[in-house]
């Protein structure tokens, strides 16, 4: 325990660093497969999924998420920014959705106090994009994605996650985004959100170049 921190923070640290072992996915690994402690909880690729940065970065981290947003996501699998998918959906279904509200807010308090890391799963620099590729991507998005996620990518929070400003979309590692496009996604039922939502797979109809665009 850190005597300089609150009881809530210390409880959150225990749940995140110990019992919850969040770093197993969200901390990058070195060449030997061990955690890169200098980048703890700032994004990692594991089992062909990219677990995003949990730090305060506004582009790729949780900088825009409030403590209540974090608690809601862990309890229900959804919030106004994102829906849990992949391995994280199992974490929510079998673990965090069972926690007390006090424990969920303790986790949130700890995560909101994480230090900034310049390069975790992404950076603050908006990447340059070829104009022709961007134009093609816009057309494909309009045909295949806009009906649910909106023409401007704003989505319908807690149902169809917004893609504009989405920290998963803005990671420098696109693994999760590409995988969801190819394979689709399905949210998990929780007590608070008992009806799961699903996104269809597009791997059968889009080429690699179209997915990249």
Where do the PLM segments sit?
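Axial heme c-ligation environment in periplasmic c-type cytochrome domains
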Residues: 49-62, 76-102, 158-163, 186-213
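Active-site substrate-binding loop specific to GH73 endo-beta-N-acetylglucosaminidase modules
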Residues: 27-81
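Post-cleavage N-terminal segment of exported redox proteins
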Residues: 1-6, 47-52, 68-135
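An amphipathic alpha-helix signature
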Residues: 67-71, 75, 105-108, 174, ...
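An acidic site on a long C-lobe helix of protein kinase domains
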Residues: 8, 18-21, 66, 100-103, ...
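Sec-exported extracytoplasmic/periplasmic mature domains
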Residues: 17-21, 27, 75-79, 97, ...
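Sequence/structural segment immediately N-terminal to covalent heme-attachment motifs in c-type
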Residues: 4-30, 35-43, 129-158, 165-183
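Flexible internal linker/loop segments at domain or repeat junctions
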Residues: 121-134, 155-157, 187-192, 196
């Amino acid at each position: 325990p850190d005597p300089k921190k609150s009881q809530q923070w210390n409880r959150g640290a225990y749940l995140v660093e110990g019992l919850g072992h969040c770093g197993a996915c969200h901390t990058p690994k070195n060449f030997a497969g061990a955690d890169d402690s200098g980048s703890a909880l700032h994004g990692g690729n594991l089992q062909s999924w990219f677990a995003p940065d949990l730090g305060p970065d506004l582009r790729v981290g949780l900088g825009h998420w409030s403590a209540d947003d974090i608690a809601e996501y862990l309890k229900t699998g959804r919030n106004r920014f994102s829906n849990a998918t992949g391995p994280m959906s199992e974490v929510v279904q079998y673990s965090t959705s069972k926690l007390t509200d006090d424990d969920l807010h303790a986790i949130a308090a700890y995560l909101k106090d994480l230090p900034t890391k310049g390069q975790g799963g992404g950076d603050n620099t908006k990447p340059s994009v070829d104009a022709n590729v961007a134009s093609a991507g816009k057309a494909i998005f309009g045909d295949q994605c806009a009906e649910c996620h909106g023409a401007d990518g704003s989505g319908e929070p807690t149902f169809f996650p917004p893609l504009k400003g989405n920290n998963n979309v803005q990671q420098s590692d696109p693994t999760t985004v590409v995988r969801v496009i190819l394979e689709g996604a399905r949210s998990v039922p929780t007590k608070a959100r008992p009806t799961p939502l699903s996104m269809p797979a597009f791997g059968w109809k889009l080429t690699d170049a179209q997915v990249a665009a």
